[in-house]
A protein has these predicted regions:
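Intrinsically disordered, low-complexity proline-rich regions
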Residues: 3, 13-19
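Acidic/polar hotspots within intrinsically disordered regions
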Residues: 5-8
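Non-catalytic alpha-helical scaffolds and adjoining flexible linkers that form interface surfaces
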Residues: 21-46, 51-271
Length: 271
């Protein structure tokens, strides 16, 4: 029987068969990305977790950005969590750690990095998004939602900002398949957090909302534009209760969700 040789997936009869698998080359690609997490590596480099528009969740090595030389000064600041960047990356889907060739601001915030309460909200959103992202799969609709959310947060009034964590926490699950069904009514006033829907009666377990908490949750689910958040007037204690309930909702629907590290800070800062 004639032997055959594979070149780029095509078998050539009569040629020797190579024992080595085909190696995928690194390709340069342009994409936007939202920085999730940064870890120092070596003396001058960073390893950065980024949610990209084209490839989803990715990890990158960024060399030389922490160098004390003139060339490296200030570049590490671009990799703060929540930063929205334009990237040119070396992408190889077989690698767990790729490299960034070029980077620059896509959107430069006015307030998120300098305003303490606003930064606390942004970091809460980043942590929530990070806990939901499990696989390096592209999700352009989710990326657009997150990009718009961070830009709106940066430019919003204090009244909108105070309700922004609630808005983000309720609308993010739609992209992961566990959005709460907004079927609240006088006949179905109890939100079952385990089932993610409203019922007429309380369940036999403790994970549910009723009364004003269920009603406000329904109102927040109806909001499609962040500007509408200014119409919902809540006090600090009520927001804390809702944030705690929404954290419970995530724990019920995402395996190994754990505890939100940013939530205690957020509870103290938002009035």
């Amino acid at each position: 029987m004639p032997r055959r040789h594979e070149i780029h997936g095509v078998y050539i009869p009569g040629s020797p068969v190579s024992p080595w698998p085909t190696i995928m080359p690194d390709r340069t690609q342009k994409t936007k990305g939202i920085v999730l997490r940064t870890v120092k590596y070596g003396e001058t480099s960073l390893i950065v977790s980024i949610f990209t528009e084209l490839f989803g969740l990715q990890s990158y090595m960024v060399s030389g950005v922490r160098a004390s030389t003139k060339k490296g000064t200030g570049k590490a600041n671009l990799f703060q969590p929540t930063a929205i960047l334009d990237l040119v990356v070396y992408h190889n889907e077989l690698k767990h750690l790729n490299r960034i060739k070029e980077f620059k601001w896509h959107h430069l915030y006015k307030n998120i990095f300098s305003d303490v309460p606003r930064n606390a909200v942004a970091l809460f959103m980043i942590e929530l998004l990070t806990k939901c992202l499990k696989q390096p799969e592209p999700n352009p609709e989710l990326f657009e939602f997150c990009e718009d959310a961070f830009i709106h947060l940066d430019e919003s009034s204090e009244a909108i900002m105070a309700n922004f964590p609630l808005f983000f926490a309720l609308h993010l699950p739609a992209f992961f398949g566990f959005r709460i069904s907004d079927d609240y009514s006088e006949e179905t006033p109890v939100l079952d957090l385990q089932e993610g829907t409203f019922f007429a009666d309380k369940p036999d377990y403790l994970h549910f909302l009723e009364g004003k908490q269920a009603e406000i949750t329904s109102e927040l689910l109806k909001i499609m534009q962040p500007e509408e958040l200014a119409q919902i007037k809540l006090n600090q204690d009520f927001r804390r209760q809702l944030l705690h309930a929404y954290e419970t909702y995530y724990r019920l629907h995402i395996q190994d969700f754990g505890t939100m590290k940013t939530l205690p800070v957020l509870r103290e800062l938002l009035g």
